[in-house]
Curated annotation (Swiss-Prot):
Homohexamer; hexamerization is dependent on ATP-binding. Component of the KaiBC complex. KaiC interacts with SasA, activating its autokinase function and leading to RpaA activation. This is Circadian clock oscillator protein KaiC. The modification Phosphoserine is found at S427. It comes from the Bacteria. Its cofactor is Mg(2+). Its EC number is 2.7.11.1, 3.6.4.-. The modification Phosphothreonine is found at T428. ATP 2 binds at residues 286-292, 327, 447, 453-455, 457, 459, 461.
């Protein structure tokens, strides 16, 4: 299966071969150039071998295209054993003649190779295997091992060029791995590998604030287009998953159907409730009632026999159940009926890309109509602003794609007074923003709520008082006799000033 790159006459277009790797085909605009070689470069542990095997595995399972894996480092038995952790039964593919592993690893006895370096024998073995198995895809792991075995770099470069030229004549699509020393240094260790390849893909595993963050960048795809920049990816139980945030399109449908927040007075403030496919952000200081609003939102889904999923990053499941019970909400009964799924995790337990993959997988399996994250600010701890922004875009984009109502909380740093909700650009991504805040009135602490923003709908612009009772939140009238409520210094308006 092949696709054409954009631009040019049809007979001159570079044909592309889909890799089948989630998200990767999006950033390379359809796949890798067919019949050409692609260099996969990265430091140790970035996932080069996994990427190569995933490329072959998908070719066999999704497109019925046999593949050849040439290994210069690991033994075939180790490759088969390691790949099983991703759920890939490569042994069965080998037995079905869909996959052939060509062992070119060094002699375990460590014998020196005499004479000049020549890949003629290996080239013929690869050529024979391609013809025998009718292979369309070839993976070579890794070119670095070839250079390490021989000192004459210029000769090795010449022989590798011969190998690539032969593979190009045969018409197979090839990926080759090579190791680099630094994440942002020279592309390859020996400085020549990238010049004998048509395309270059760089995998990185950068340490950011004590956490590793994997990214993939397409440096060049000769003769065709691709997306620029680095894109986060993970290596999960099913292999490589790329998150092509820049490739997301704003093409999702928009619903006029309203759903309830679970708080009648809040629905009135929102013009009749939230839109069915909207993203709602509740922001406020600790203790203002954000988790309570999440619980009411989930309870309303249960009341309508709809599924909801809650991702909690600040409280344990037992604590969530206890708190919900104190408000008259029975999360356990919802779980027993299969209408609620709660997933609790420490934000620091893994990287943001892995959290995003967990969220997408859980939603894909449970298929809820509503989701909630409590809270986004917990996930922002210890990560770069750009990584957090990409995570939020990934979550909201996926929720929009699946037409799921998303309810997210954000803890403000300021206990009282105005606070920013735009530092991480969250406000521009969400459809509705609810502000919760403490205010001091007549020497007592009170809570205030305001619908700060609601796309496509009228909403109440007043700042209203609300209290938390055993039955949940009760929204009262606005602070009609005060102004500058959210400034942290409310001022009472006299009758003369009102006039």
């Amino acid at each position: 299966m092949q696709s054409s790159s954009a631009g040019g006459s049809s007979h001159m277009q570079v044909q592309k071969l889909p890799t089948g790797i989630e998200g990767f085909d999006d950033i390379c605009h359809g796949g890798l150039p067919s019949g050409r070689s692609t260099l996969i470069s990265g430091t140790s542990g970035t996932g080069k071998t996994v990427f190569s095997l995933h490329f072959l595995h998908n070719g066999i399972t999704q497109f019925d295209e046999p593949g050849i894996f040439v290994t210069f480092e690991e033994s075939p038995s180790d490759i088969l054993r390691n790949s099983a952790s991703f759920g890939w039964n490569l042994q069965e593919m080998v037995e079905q003649d869909k996959l052939f592993i060509l062992d070119a690893s060094p002699d375990p006895d460590g014998q020196d190779v005499a004479g000049s370096f020549d890949l003629s024998g290996l080239i013929e073995r690869i050529n024979y295997a391609i013809v025998k198995y009718k292979a369309k895809r070839v993976a070579i792991d890794s070119m670095t091992a070839v250079f390490q075995q021989y000192d004459a770099i210029s000769v090795v470069r010449r022989e590798i060029f011969r190998l690539i030229a032969r593979l190009k004549v045969i018409g197979v699509t090839t990926v080759m791995t090579t190791e680099r020393i630094d994440e942002y240094g020279p592309i390859a260790r020996y400085g020549v590998e990238e010049f004998v390849s048509d395309n270059v893909v760089i995998l990185r595993n950068v340490l950011e604030t004590e956490k590793r963050r994997r990214t993939v960048e397409i440096l060049k795809l000769r003769g065709t287009t691709h997306m620029k920049g680095e894109f986060p990816f993970t290596m999960g139980t099913h292999g490589v998953s790329v998150f092509p945030l820049g490739a997301m399109r704003l093409t999702q449908r928009s619903s006029n159907v309203r759903i309830s927040s679970g708080v009648p007075n809040l629905d009135e403030m929102c013009g009749g409730g939230f839109f069915k496919d909207s993203i709602i952000l509740v922001t406020g200081a600790t203790g203002t009632g954000k988790t309570l609003l999440v619980s009411k939102f989930i309870e309303d889904a249960f009341r309508n026999q709809e599924r909801a999923i809650l991702f909690a990053y600040e409280e344990s499941r037992a604590q969530l159940l206890r708190n919900a019970t104190s408000w008259g909400i029975d999360f356990e009964e919802m779980e027993r009926q299969g209408l609620l799924k709660i997933i609790c995790a420490y934000p620091e337990s893994t990287g943001l890309e892995d959290h995003l993959e967990i969220i997408k997988t859980a939603i894909g399996q449970f298929k809820p109509s509503r989701m909630a994250i409590d809270s986004l600010s917990a996930l922002a701890r210890g990560v770069s602003l750009n990584a957090f922004r990409q995570f939020v875009i990934g979550v909201t984009g996926y929720a929009k794609q699946e037409e799921i109502a998303g309810f997210f909380t954000n803890t403000a740093e300021e206990f009282m007074g105005s606070h920013s909700i735009t530092d991480s650009h969250i406000s521009t991504i969400t459809d509705t923003i609810l502000l919760l805040q403490y205010v001091e009135i007549r020497g007592e602490m009170a809570r205030a709520v305001n619908v700060f923003k609601m796309r496509g709908s009228w909403h109440d612009k007043r700042i209203r008082e609300y209290v938390i009772t055993d039955n949940g939140p009760q929204i009262k009238d606005s602070f009609s006799n005060f102004e500058r409520i959210f400034s942290g210094a409310p001022h009472r308006i006299t009758d003369d000033e009102r006039a």
